[in-house]
């Protein structure tokens, strides 16, 4: 090492000091001043851990005055370097810049500059960086991107709808699955895909106020999408940042009532630029041809300004054909412009549905059925398929011919592209519901307090009185005080204790209407029998609820009982339990179905036991009988329940308000008759073609199988743990597929993306994550992985490395140079270019003669043969072969250009094939089905042209 005053060096061990200047040299030591950090360092001259900073022709360097110079020549004189070139800011030529006057805060951005400046990283970090690039590329190319990372079971019909809709440009669809089939999850998967692909950057979700928390939790816990709830208070706070408060967040969640009640907020929502609008409970948007409701007009105004719209409703169109048309009108007002025309068009589609029913039955096709199919499809297309169906061909061949006819008929279906509806009748695998009604005597304490409350009721409305009489424990506490221990004499509590003792090995979910009841029940179970239980109510934070749910889910040492309030249980499902206790009853059938739906969902493997204790001679008994005998709402899902309730609401409320059974028998009889008629109407009106289209058939199963095959990916596990090690996160293996990850003091960064300050528990196993709500399911799409990859690539981790290869077949001193180039097409995310040309790593390995060995030498096997070198020694080795490395980099550039051309060509072919195929299919469909939107065709055509232009 030769030192001279004024030379510039960089520390190998403390690169954050900046660029140092030699200020003193003697026989044994050298002293450097690091002006940027105002530090001095004294080193032993013969082995100083520093590297000389030398720039070359073509580099751009910065002076201490702030201007930059494009280097055209380098002169060395007296051990000091002088750079000559052109100033970037003034274009002045032949400008001289001595190395002593270089910027003290110089940064090395190119990997080769870092290498020559001694900023050399470890080999394991270089390997991590390459794997990060490789995995990022593979994930962007995956056709399942956006579907693999959700914390949800792999339900085929949900995955099919999400896959079908999520890839569209600005999807505008109606999701109308029956209760319990997962519309919220379908919407979340679509949102997730749209966000990951860049098609949607700003999303607005509008829901009823009572469902805000449910949506917030579902989006965060299942999809790692962090929405902000906007109310008046949040809007006022946001004024400091923007005139329009809705511009201050990318993902916004608010209630329909909030927007409807304030003209100002409504106008601000409409003015904000949204990419995707999601509306839950869309059947509440009332409409008729003369006077649409205010709620409908609000959503209509937002939908007109928003490219993508998802409407969610569980109400079948047969129960309100006009409102069904109104929802479709929100999606495409040009297509659905006239109700009478729509009714006539729907009537014309009936033969299509009849033909599909005939095909799917597997029975011999009648002449009528064949004639109907021939009217809808061309004769030359169907005749060969008819011959196969009627021949003695193998069953598989016949089934394939029937399926091909069904597929062709689907393309002509009126609303098949904008409407998806799955029914329990069409999707198998749901458990039985077993009802256990438990009548109990009314305690005298309750009888007295209820009698007094009735006398003191004054001008209370019938509805308020009916609601009050359902909860006698609350009436008792009104007179005796909040501390009154009603649970000491309530027979429902004694019965519950016996039930829990008889079923000690079962998890039991208890739901009560009020949070106060839930809390006092937990106290009663704990104090009277020492039963392990936990509560779940709206007064708890999301983290507290997660912990309670996790405690309940825990198999060993967990809670036997989870006691929920009505609101607190929204959006939470506990399929691992099959025992449901309704300590009291909700006021309407929708809430009753919501309660049972906590357990009765796809994924439930056992029959559900529904226990309903009630006090005889009270409103509880009357309501239980009406739900059971009038609706059969306990025994099966009741899509007609709300319609029946609305019809008889006045009579129901009047009976519940008095607590007397006068008129109950006739009410039950009339309700049962109407319920049966409505269900029959639903069954007759079932659109089997739509159901077949919505559940996806074999294609849906293939999607589920593809995703299942990626679960438990050992490559992901190894990469994630290696990533966490490199960043410096603490990892504590807790067993049961669980690892606790927490921030450490000496991390590479101050905070890690996606990791809370207090840390979190992670798992790579989907089933574990589904049963443990306190765990994060780690996938390639999780923020901790995506954020970690971005961190590695942006922070320069592993940009350079030096290693030794111990191989007797190679002579000592053999130089191998491994380079990784990244093809990065700069374009807006919305362009969709990442689908065909994501960031693509090109690996080149040069031997000393300039031959590219990358095809013969695979990265991982080569990496396993390498031994680490300390940084100081690595810097010396690099300096000794710096000239050779420069030459090899020049040759590698030529090889890279050839490979780049191949990458471009392949991407262009793939893009043309995909987009042209998609465009041709949609154009052909538009000829027979007007539900293909012109905007979608235009967008695909524009994407095609724009993407070709971007490549060249």
Swiss-Prot record:
The keyword ATP-binding applies. A motif (DEAH box) lies at residues 280-283. Keywords: Activator, ATP-binding, DNA-binding, Helicase, Hydrolase, Nucleotide-binding, Transcription, Transcription regulation. InterPro entries: Helicase_ATP-bd, Helicase_C-like, Helicase_RapA, P-loop_NTPase, RapA_C, SNF2-like_sf, SNF2/RAD54-like_C, SNF2_N. It is an enzyme of class 3 (hydrolase). Gene3D superfamilies: 2.30.30.140, 2.30.30.930, 3.30.360.80, 6.10.140.1500, 6.10.140.2230, P-loop containing nucleotide triphosphate hydrolases (3.40.50.300), Tandem AAA-ATPase domain (3.40.50.10810). Residues 164-334 form the Helicase ATP-binding domain. The keyword Hydrolase applies. Transcription regulator that activates transcription by stimulating RNA polymerase (RNAP) recycling in case of stress conditions such as supercoiled DNA or high salt concentrations. Probably acts by releasing the RNAP, when it is trapped or immobilized on tightly supercoiled DNA. Does not activate transcription on linear DNA. Probably not involved in DNA repair. PANTHER family: DNA ANNEALING HELICASE AND ENDONUCLEASE ZRANB3 FAMILY MEMBER, SWI_SNF-RELATED MATRIX-ASSOCIATED ACTIN-DEPENDENT REGULATOR OF CHROMATIN SUBFAMILY A-LIKE PROTEIN 1. Interacts with the RNAP. Has a higher affinity for the core RNAP than for the holoenzyme. Its ATPase activity is stimulated by binding to RNAP. This is RNA polymerase-associated protein RapA. The lineage of its organism: Bacteria, Pseudomonadati, Pseudomonadota, Gammaproteobacteria, Vibrionales.
């Amino acid at each position: 090492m030769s030192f001279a005053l004024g030379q510039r060096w960089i520390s190998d061990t403390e690169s954050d000091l900046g660029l140092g200047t030699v200020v003193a040299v003697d026989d044994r030591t050298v002293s450097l001043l690091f002006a940027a950090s105002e530090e001095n360092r004294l080193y032993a001259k013969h082995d100083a851990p520093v590297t000389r900073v030398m720039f070359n022709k073509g580099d751009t360097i910065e002076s201490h005055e702030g201007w930059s110079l494009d280097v055209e020549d380098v002169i060395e004189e007296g051990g000091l370097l002088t750079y000559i070139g052109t100033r970037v800011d003034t274009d002045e030529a032949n400008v001289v810049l001595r190395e002593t006057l270089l910027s003290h805060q110089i940064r090395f951005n190119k990997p080769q500059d870092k290498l020559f400046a001694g900023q050399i990283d470890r080999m394991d970090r270089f390997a991590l960086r390459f794997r990060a690039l490789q995995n990022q590329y593979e994930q962007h190319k995956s056709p399942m991107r956006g579907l693999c990372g959700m914390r949800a079971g792999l339900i085929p019909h949900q995955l099919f709808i999400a896959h079908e809709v999520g890839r569209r440009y600005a999807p505008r669809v109606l999701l109308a699955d029956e209760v319990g089939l997962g519309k919220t999850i379908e919407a979340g998967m679509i949102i997730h895909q749209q966000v990951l692909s860049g098609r949607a950057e700003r999303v607005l979700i509008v829901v009823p106020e009572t469902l805000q928390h449910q949506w917030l939790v579902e989006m965060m816990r299942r999809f790692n999408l962090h929405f902000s709830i906007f109310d008046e208070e949040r809007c006022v706070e946001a004024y400091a940042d923007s005139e329009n408060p809705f511009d201050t967040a990318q993902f916004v969640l608010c209630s329909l009532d909030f927007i409807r009640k304030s003209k100002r907020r409504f106008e601000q929502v409409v003015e904000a630029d949204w990419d995707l609008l999601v509306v839950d409970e869309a059947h509440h948007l009332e409409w008729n041809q003369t006077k649409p409701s205010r709620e409908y007009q609000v959503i209509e105004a937002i939908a007109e300004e928003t490219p993508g719209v998802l409407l969610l409703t569980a109400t079948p169109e047969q129960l309100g054909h006009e409102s069904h048309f109104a929802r479709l009108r929100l999606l495409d007002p040009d297509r659905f412009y006239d109700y009478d025309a729509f009714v006539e068009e729907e009537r014309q589609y009936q033969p299509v549905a009849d033909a599909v029913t005939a095909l799917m039955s597997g029975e011999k096709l009648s002449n009528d059925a064949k004639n109907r199919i021939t009217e809808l499809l061309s004769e030359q297309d169907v005749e060969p398929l008819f011959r196969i169906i009627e021949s003695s061909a193998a069953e598989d061949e016949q089934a394939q011919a029937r399926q091909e006819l069904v597929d062709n008929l689907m393309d002509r279906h009126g609303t098949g592209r904008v409407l998806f509806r799955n029914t329990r009748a069409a999707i198998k695998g749901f458990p039985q519901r077993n009802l256990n009604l438990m009548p109990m005597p009314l305690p005298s304490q309750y009888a007295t307090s209820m009698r007094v409350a009735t006398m003191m009721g004054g001008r209370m409305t019938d509805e308020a009185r009916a609601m009050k009489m359902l909860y006698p424990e609350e009436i008792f506490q009104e007179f005796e005080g909040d501390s009154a221990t009603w649970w000491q004499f309530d027979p429902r509590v004694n019965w519950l204790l016996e039930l829990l003792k008889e079923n000690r090995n079962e998890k039991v979910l208890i739901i009560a209407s009020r949070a106060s009841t839930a809390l006092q029940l937990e106290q009663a179970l704990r104090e009277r029998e020492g039963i392990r239980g936990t509560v779940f109510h709206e007064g708890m934070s999301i983290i507290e609820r997660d912990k309670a749910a996790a405690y309940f889910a825990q198999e060993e040492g967990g809670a036997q009982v989870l006691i929920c309030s009505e609101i607190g249980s929204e959006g939470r499902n506990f399929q691992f339990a099959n025992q449901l206790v309704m300590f009291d009853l909700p006021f309407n059938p929708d809430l009753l179905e919501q309660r049972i739906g906590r357990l009765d969902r796809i994924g439930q493997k056992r029959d559900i036991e529904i226990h309903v204790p009630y006090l005889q001679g009270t409103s509880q008994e009357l309501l239980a009988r009406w739900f059971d005998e009038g609706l059969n709402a306990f025994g099966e899902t009741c899509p007609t329940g709300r319609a029946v309730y609305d019809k008889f609401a006045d009579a129901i409320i009047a009976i519940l308000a008095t607590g007397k059974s006068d008129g109950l028998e006739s009410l039950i009889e009339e309700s049962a008759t109407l319920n049966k008629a409505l269900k029959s109407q639903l069954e007759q009106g079932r659109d089997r073609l739509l159901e077949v289209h919505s559940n996806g058939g074999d294609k849906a199963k293939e999607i589920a199988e593809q995703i299942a095959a990626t679960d438990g990916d050992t490559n992901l596990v190894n990469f994630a743990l290696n990533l966490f090690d490199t960043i410096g996160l603490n990892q504590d293996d807790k067993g049961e597929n669980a690892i606790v990850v927490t921030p450490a003091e000496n991390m590479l960064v101050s905070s890690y993306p996606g990791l809370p300050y207090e840390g979190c528990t992670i798992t790579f196993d989907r089933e574990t994550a589904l049963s443990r709500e306190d765990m994060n399911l780690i996938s390639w799409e999780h923020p901790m992985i995506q954020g970690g990859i971005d961190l590695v690539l942006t922070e320069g981790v592993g940009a350079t490395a030096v290693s030794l290869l111990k191989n007797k077949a190679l002579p000592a001193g053999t130089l191998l140079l491994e380079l990784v180039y990244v093809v990065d097409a700069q374009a807006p995310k919305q362009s969709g270019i990442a689908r065909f040309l994501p960031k693509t790593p090109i690996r080149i390995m040069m031997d000393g003669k300039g031959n590219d060995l990358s095809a013969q030498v695979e990265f991982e096997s080569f990496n396993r043969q390498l031994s680490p070198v300390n940084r100081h020694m690595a810097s010396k080795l690099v300096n000794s072969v710096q000239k050779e490395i420069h030459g090899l980099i020049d040759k590698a550039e030529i090889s890279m250009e050839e490979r780049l051309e191949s990458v471009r060509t392949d991407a262009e072919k793939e893009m043309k094939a995909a987009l042209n195929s998609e465009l041709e299919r949609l154009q052909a469909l538009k000829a027979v089905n007007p539900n293909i939107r012109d905007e979608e065709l235009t967008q695909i055509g524009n994407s095609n042209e724009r993407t070709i232009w971007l490549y060249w």
